[in-house]
């Protein structure tokens, strides 16, 4: 078994691989108090519920965009699973070339997404949209080079901003609206959140494609916690909610 873990702004998201397939996954809120012990006990409980033997774990691979949680997760894996994780940091082999001004600023999550995308669609131009706390857009050229991207507020972040900065607008269930024309305040917020996000993404992707991929249109991949909401739009070529974890598994294979 290979355990792949991503420390995100909202959740610690993990998957247990057997071969190249995720057999089990877990989420732990990264906004709650997280010590090595609380996380370690959570992991042991998860493996016990799934009837998995921690002795069968061959490796743990870790990516993070939340610096202050890295120590706790790392320590939990060492103390409770008996394994020192491979952390996706500079110096780890990825097979990904970077054509950006500050390579060290690129988030580990975006590196892992890009690696997985290249594995799925070698020799193709690719754009990956990750619907997380922030929505990130990554452009990868056909020669396995990350050439840049865009970042915008995620759907939940946009909703929280509305509820916190306005007097009469509250949080709503994030779901695909039945119509762009809302008949209630709730449905109007949902329309604005979903179609506003989709419209922004389409415009950014269109401009990136015109500027960089005019001769070979890119494959469009959606991933992240809110990717499934856009399924019925049939805009993306493929939706893979756990793309990042697959990228971590591939990176482990390159470095073992």
UniProtKB/Swiss-Prot annotation:
Enumerate the Gene3D superfamilies for this protein: 3.30.420.40
Q: Which residues hold ATP?
A: 6-13, 133
Question: Which InterPro entries does this one have?
Answer: ATPase_NBD (IPR043129), Type_III_PanK (IPR004619)
EC main group: transferase
Cofactor dependence: NH4(+); K(+)
- Cite a GO CC annotation: cytoplasm
Q: Name one GO molecular function term.
A: metal ion binding
* The reaction(s) this protein catalyses: (R)-pantothenate + ATP = (R)-4'-phosphopantothenate + ADP + H(+)
List the Pfam families hit by this protein, alphabetically: Pan_kinase
Q: Which UniProt keywords apply?
A: ATP-binding, Coenzyme A biosynthesis, Cytoplasm, Kinase, Metal-binding, Nucleotide-binding, Potassium, Transferase
> What EC number(s) does its UniProt record assign?
2.7.1.33
GO BP annotations listed? coenzyme A biosynthetic process
Comment on bound cofactor: A monovalent cation. Ammonium or potassium.
Q: Where is the active site?
A: 109
Q: Which residues bind substrate?
A: 107-110, 185
Q: Which family does it belong to?
A: Belongs to the type III pantothenate kinase family.
The free-text function statement in the UniProt record for this protein reads: Catalyzes the phosphorylation of pantothenate (Pan), the first step in CoA biosynthesis.
The protein's name in its UniProt record: Type III pantothenate kinase 1
């Amino acid at each position: 078994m290979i355990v792949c873990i991503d420390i995100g702004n909202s959740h610690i998201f993990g998957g247990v691989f057997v071969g190249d397939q995720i057999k089990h996954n877990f989420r732990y809120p990264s906004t709650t108090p997280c010590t090595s012990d609380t996380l370690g006990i959570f992991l042991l409980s998860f493996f016990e519920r799934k009837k998995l033997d921690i002795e069968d774990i061959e490796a743990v691979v870790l990516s993070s965009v939340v610096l202050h949680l890295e120590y706790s997760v790392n320590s939990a894996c060492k103390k409770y699973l008996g394994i020192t994780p491979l952390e996706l940091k500079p110096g780890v082999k990825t097979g990904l070339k970077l054509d950006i001004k500050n390579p060290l600023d690129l988030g580990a999550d975006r590196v892992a997404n890009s690696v997985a995308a290249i594995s799925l669609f070698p020799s193709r131009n690719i754009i990956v949209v990750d619907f997380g706390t922030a929505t990130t857009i990554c452009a990868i050229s056909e020669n396995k080079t990350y050439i840049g991207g865009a970042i915008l507020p995620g759907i939940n972040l946009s909703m929280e901003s509305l509820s916190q900065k306005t007097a009469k607008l509250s949080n709503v269930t994030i779901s695909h609206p039945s119509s762009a024309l809302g008949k209630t305040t709730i449905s109007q917020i949902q329309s604005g959140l979903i179609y506003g996000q989709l419209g922004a993404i389409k415009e950014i992707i269109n401009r990136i494609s015109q500027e960089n991929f005019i001769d070979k249109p890119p494959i469009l991949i959606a991933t992240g916690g809110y990717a499934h909401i856009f399924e019925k739009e049939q805009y993306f070529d493929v939706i893979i909610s756990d793309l990042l974890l697959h990228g971590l598994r591939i990176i482990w294979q390159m470095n073992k």
